[in-house]
From Swiss-Prot:
UniProt GO cellular component terms: cytoplasm
Annotated GO biological process: D-amino acid catabolic process; tRNA metabolic process
Major subcellular location class: cytoplasm
UniProt name for this protein: D-aminoacyl-tRNA deacylase
E.C. number: 3.1.1.96
Name of the gene: dtd
Sequence motif Gly-cisPro motif, important for rejection of L-amino acids, residues: 137-138
Taxon lineage: Bacteria, Bacillati, Bacillota, Clostridia, Eubacteriales
Source organism: Clostridium botulinum (strain Hall / ATCC 3502 / NCTC 13319 / Type A)
Localization: Cytoplasm
Length: 149
């Protein structure tokens, strides 16, 4: 399971011109699910994301987590995080989990976050989305539950 975690001032997702999810200060998470992912990957990434100390304290040090600041989170499914561009010019998405299986793991991930964070928004799984991200910093972290980064 892969995630691009961005510290944001605000973020929103639109589908067909209508806002389906929006947040204020917190994290925008683009989430990719692979064929090898299990509930253990969900647990690992959830704990890592909500406890990442990427928010500044009173001394401007990155010492606070999403939970510490009471921040929001928006989670957007993005299978293209498993695009393999090593051969040719067209990405291969063979490692990405598709369809119903990915939808189930995505929802389990979202539900696990909702147990820890008050304001959780999402995109629409499988939809063509417009994602608006107002970065803060910017601070962007790449995470992989298989630790390949």
């Amino acid at each position: 399971m892969r995630a691009v975690v961005q510290r944001v001032i605000s973020s929103k997702v639109e589908v067909d011109g209508r806002v389906i999810g929006s947040i204020g200060k917190g994290l925008n998470v683009l989430l990719g699910i692979s064929k090898e992912d299990t509930e253990e990957d969900i647990k690992y990434l959830k704990e890592k994301i909500i406890n990442l100390r990427i928010f500044e304290d009173e001394n401007e040090k990155l010492n606070k987590s999403l939970l510490d600041i009471g921040g929001d989170i928006i989670i957007v499914s993005q299978f293209t995080l498993y695009g393999d561009c090593r051969k040719g010019r067209r990405p291969s998405f063979i490692e990405a989990l598709g369809g119903e299986e990915a939808y189930i793991l995505y929802n389990k991930f979202v539900e696990s976050i909702k147990k820890e964070v008050n304001n959780v928004a999402t995109g629409e799984f499988g939809a063509d989305m417009k994602v608006y991200i107002e970065n803060d910093g910017p601070v962007t972290i790449l995470l992989d539950s298989k630790k390949t980064f």
